[in-house]
Amino acid sequence: MAWEYETFGPDGQCKLFGVNIFDYVWQTTGKRVKVQDPIYHQDHTFEVWRVEIDGQLHSFAAGEFSNCVWGFYLEKE
């Protein structure tokens, strides 16, 4: 399994899983993964989170690429 870039957006305004992900409570999994910025190809270590949306659990990796600009990654096969 690999973590692949999904989307990015400003703090408080990013759509993931069809919703604004910042409107939900993120629960840490305690895991961290290495990812690469898709534009500048810089390596980052982002935390893996879990969120419940409409009764379904979703996992994602997220962190800041730069001040208040968040990147989101999903685990893919």
Task: Annotate the PLM regions.
Residues 1-22:
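N-terminal trafficking/processing presequences and adjacent post-cleavage segments
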Residues 16-76:
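Acidic, low-complexity, intrinsically disordered interaction modules
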